[in-house]
Amino acid sequence: MIYKYLGNNTLKNIKIIHIVGPNNFDNSKKFENYKQIEFIKDMTDFYSSIDLQVSRAGGGVLEAVLINIPLLLIPYKHGTTSTHQSMNAEYLVKSKFAKLCSNYESLEYEFKKLEQLDNSLFEEFSKNNVIKIGNDFIVNKIIDEINKWVIKIFIF
């Protein structure tokens, strides 16, 4: 799908890194602002080099959320992964970490905004709105649950 936009110069002002997966590298796809990568070994370096991630809405988007990279999500609509991808996308959009692109027209609209260097897309995201995850959060949730039970035990 990305080739459609590269071929008609829609995204000439944007550098694109396309992770294509093992054995999917295509030497015929040559564009000045486009680079294919089969696999990323160091995700820290990769994430520090991007401003926006366009991807499906599987579990892999959580790393981007954790380090506040805005997302354009295109949930997979077929098969067994469709339900969790829709749920992930819905939650991330509601939390202002992502924008949902449910069809090619909505994705093209966002690409055109980016091409015009329209930063409103980034302003829509809560850059400092970190989802509460990680060990400290989990430990505190467990302690809260234990405290609820301890209080219930002493009340009865």
Description of each model-found segment:
Residues 1-156:
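Nucleotide-activated sugar donor-binding and catalytic core shared by glycosyltransferases
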